[in-house]
């Protein structure tokens, strides 16, 4: 068997948070939106910025920078909302995550991805699926299903409609 047949190529959407490169599997991403006004929801988690109306569906919007203790996302011309499907305990929830900017879709095979380090990252490593190497930069590949606890997702899901 050739080396190419043994490595699997995966597609990732890359984006920035606080100057660092992150990525999520394209299969988790439903769409990318320009930043739009977010309706605040009182008495909710600090990192939940509010909800948006997405073609008649209520979608909660999460600030990943706040979740990762990187400070609040500032709205700029590049700020985007990445609409994703997150699965926890067998339930799929659609939510939007704020990104400072969305970069591109890249392909990486398993040889370009190292296991998450236990030190030296600004976020807890159980959120990190691995560290991708693309040319001379590192990209933290998030396991978006592990970013939120079951309790956090249940609070967020109260403001969302079920995934279709």
Residue ranges of model-derived segments:
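An acidic, low-aromatic, low-complexity terminal/linker signal
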Residues: 1-164
